[in-house]
Amino acid sequence: AMAAQAGGPVTAHDIDPGRMRDIPARAARAGAEITVQPAPQGVFDIVLCDAPCSGSGSWRRAPEAKWRLTEDRLAELCTMQDAVLDAAAPFVAYATCSLLAPENSARVAAFQDRHPGWVMDFDRQFTLQDGGDGFYLALLKRG
């Protein structure tokens, strides 16, 4: 909603359509308009990749999730994260609610290895000390 308030059109897509059900109502409450697309279409100036992740940044609110994460599941998530990044636009904001480096800085580094023309403009790990759940954000652009 914050991006929509900046004046440009905002389009939302999730592989699980159920996760997008409440987006228009939530955006309207925030004074914004967000178009929901069941399948991504067209070319976008920037893509926010809210990648599937372990959710380790929110384990303080759901500690049982910590015990469900296995090495195999982490590897599966990392593979999905790579696929999300590889399908990106000319400018990408990559985000997870994870504190785990394999899902964050390691994914960005692997992406840059696969796509050498990309540079990272911003990279930050937000922790509980920042006043919320754990979160990671990297801004990437074609060099």
Which stretches of residues belong to each language-model region?
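S-adenosylmethionine
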Residues: 1-143
